[in-house]
Amino acid sequence: MQNLFSGLIKASRRSLYFPFSLGHFANDFVPCSVVVLAPAIALEMGLNPMEVGLLLTLHSLGSALGYFPSGLMADSVRNRGNLLMLTFWWVGLGYLIASWAPGFWSLAFLFALAGCGDAAWHPLATAILVQADPQNRGQALGFHAIGGTLSAVIGPVIVGFLLASMDWRETLHWIILPTLLVGILFLQIRKWVPEQPERKAISKEDFQHLWKSWTKKTGLLIICLISSYHMSLVALMSMIPLYLREFHGLSSAITGFAFGMMVLFGAFMQPLMGRFSDRVGRRRVIVFGIATAAVCAFMIPVLENFGLLMMIIIFLLVGVGLLEGIRSSVLAAAVEYTGSREGTTLGFAFTLMDGLGAFGALLAGWAAGIQFSHAFLLAGILCTFSLILCFSVSLRS
């Protein structure tokens, strides 16, 4: 046993894939579970679908504020291990305080504040990984994404079972424990993170270069692609727990399990699709994922008319899994477009995804308020728009 543990430690020292994937899992565990907590919060506070969508949107918008500053620090701070370690305590303590929120607006504010800590992790960790393995950016981002996607699988399942025996506030107290425990582990792991050979303080010229890159036609098209892609993913995912609970009458435990399985596919597809896009090009992989997800989304109202619940769950699983699966390819395409300042570029891309992309939850909540199946039609329309943009922009392999 001691030899096995020593071997794991040595392997972790050689590669940051596992510790960073573990860190991603721990940091995302609570934020990914909020969507399953939402029906219980709505029941206690008397929220309608539109207000649930607004809560999820504000949660993501607040989180998005942490991405870009973190990206800047990823490119300029010498010792990034300490910053990574601090994110766990920010997230854990932040959501603990949020569990005591008395009303909707205080809860939305505290969720957003806690989410900033989770957001800060992403540009820091991903910048370190793509700088360490520049020839396999898609694969590196995919391995990092496994942890986050697994948290979106395991978190909702655990939350679903916990909600069967306690309220959402007590549930929140339990699910912050993995974050705090990994925060303790990172007191040691932070020492494994290589320091940057030299400080690369971002200058006025760097900002001008980034501004010039992103305001060109190609840059603007990529911005629209990233935003619409993530809006379609958020629109598809945000209403699924409420849809299964309220419309189909499934229990919290079954809802959490079904939602977890829907993103399990994406957990294992991200490194595979990322590596595949490293070999055959970003566009082919992204087009395949978005096109298939669009078909799945448009099929939900049809299947609903026939009362085929199991088929609905299968189509949602495929749609969510493939949209999650191409995330690393989309991020790698953004890094390759600018060609430098990986942390800043990734921070900008994450801001677009969780900032502008967060409006997918608000729009889906509005559509679901009319009829639940309309939320999935909206996701299909957003996928179609993303598909058009993908054919309009040149993506390097």
How should these model regions be labeled?
Residues 120-133, 324-338:
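Intracellular juxtamembrane helix-capping segments at the cytosolic ends
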Residues 340-370:
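A late C-terminal transmembrane helix in Major Facilitator Superfamily
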Residues 283-330:
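C-terminal transmembrane helical hairpin of 12-TM major facilitator-type secondary transporters
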Residues 110-148:
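Cytoplasmic helix-loop-helix junction between adjacent transmembrane helices
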Residues 1-11, 193-222:
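Juxtamembrane intracellular "pre-TM" segments in multi-pass secondary transporters
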Residues 65-102, 277-280:
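Conserved MFS/SLC helix-loop-helix module at the cytosolic interface between two early adjacent transmembrane helices
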Residues 144-191:
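Helix-loop-helix hairpin linking two adjacent transmembrane segments in secondary transporters
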Residues 34-35, 218-264:
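Extracytoplasmic gate region of multi-pass secondary transporters
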